[in-house]
C-alpha cells in the first residue's frame, strides 16, 4: 500500500494481509486503483443531498418527531421526503427533504473531476447506457436540480401547510455515489443500495453505494467476513464470537419465535428503550 497524508503530503508504504475500502464516495477510485478483476464494469453516479432548514423557535417547538411521506415515482428510496426534528450546533431545528442535487464530486470536498476521472474502458458503456435504462430517475434528478426555493417550500406545505419561504433556508448535507453496475448484456444498471466487491483471494474488499448509514453496516461487515475469511469463519472460535456479537447469526428469526423474542429483548435493553 502507498498511503499519502493529505495534510502534510507525506507518503508511507505499508504491507497488509487484508485491506478494506470503506471510504464512502472515495471507495470507487481506490477500488479501481487496486486493479482487481472484480472491480471491472463498476462506475459511480454522484448525487448531493440538500435540506430545507428552519431554526425559528416558535416554529420548531411545534414539531417533535420524524414524519415520512412517499417518494416520487422513479426516485431512489433514500429520497423519501420527511420532516425531522434535529439539534444543530446545540440548537433545535427542523429539517425537510432530502432534495437531490447534481455534482461531479464523489466527496463533499472532492474534485470536480472525480466523475470523469473514474471512467475506464471497462465501465464506459455501462455509464453511458445507464441514463437510457433509468429514464424515471433521470427525469427526477433533472427536476430536482432545477427546482426553485419556492418549489421546495411548496413541497414542504404537504407536511406543514403554513410554511413560509422566509422561515426556511437551503443547506447542503451529505454526498452519495450510487453504484453503476454492468449487466449481463453489457449495459448499465443503477443500484440504490450498497454492495461489497471483494477480491477472489480475499485480500481486499470495498463497500460501494449509498445507504441510510448504520442500517446496513452490520450486514455488510458480515458479508466481508464470510467472503474474505471463509475458512476462519467456519472455525469454532469465530463461530462462538459471531454468535456473541450477533445472537441470531446463522439462524432464522422467522422460524424461531423464542430466538426472535430474545433478540428483541436484547435490542430494547441495549438501546435503553425499555
Please place each PLM-identified region on the residue numbering.
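Core beta-strand elements of the Rossmann-like FAD/NAD(P) dinucleotide-binding domain
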Residues: 7-18
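Central beta-strand plus flanking loop segment that forms part of the substrate or channel wall
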Residues: 37-65
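Acidic, Ser/Thr-rich low-complexity intrinsically disordered segments
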Residues: 247-274
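C-terminal catalytic lobe of FAD-dependent flavoproteins
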Residues: 106-236
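Flavin (primarily FAD) binding-site architecture
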Residues: 21-37
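An anion/pyrophosphate-binding glycine-rich loop and adjacent beta-alpha core
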Residues: 58-134
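Short beta-strand segments that buttress and anchor functional surface loops
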Residues: 1-6, 207-210
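Short hydrophobic-aromatic micro-motifs
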Residues: 21, 93-98, 206-207
